[in-house]
Amino acid sequence: MAKTNDAIKIIDKMNHNDLEIQEMVAIASINAEVAQLIYETRIKAGLTQKELAGLIGTKQPVIARLEDADYEGHSLSMLQKIASALNKRVEIHLTSIE
């Protein structure tokens, strides 16, 4: 079996039969991905957190929380507001578990 240095794959192998841990890891992974996506898109648009907040009618600390991978309060409606302000659209896909 080939070695891997992918942390998610290693954790998955260690907890293969523990569905609760698998779910926690999946949620943490999604939160991190959403936070990174918001951050990268804002930076590419050349906006500060405060400027993006102004575009969607909120305050800078809200954007800071959304860009924090540990934040668990992401919502699709807020993501849609951010996408619209940055001239993007939200796409959601479900894929098979490998």
Predicted segments, located by residue:
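Helix-turn-helix DNA-binding elements, focusing on the entry/boundary residues of the two helices
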Residues: 38, 49, 60, 76-79
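Short basic helix-loop element that most often maps to the first helix and adjoining turn
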Residues: 1-4, 36-55
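Short glycine/serine/threonine/alanine-rich loop segments
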Residues: 47, 58, 88
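N-terminal flexible/basic segments that precede or flank functional cores
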Residues: 1-33
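Short, charged recognition helix plus adjacent turn
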Residues: 94-98
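Recognition helix of helix-turn-helix/homeodomain-like DNA-binding domains
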Residues: 56-72
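DNA major-groove recognition helix of helix-turn-helix/homeodomain DNA-binding modules
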Residues: 76-92
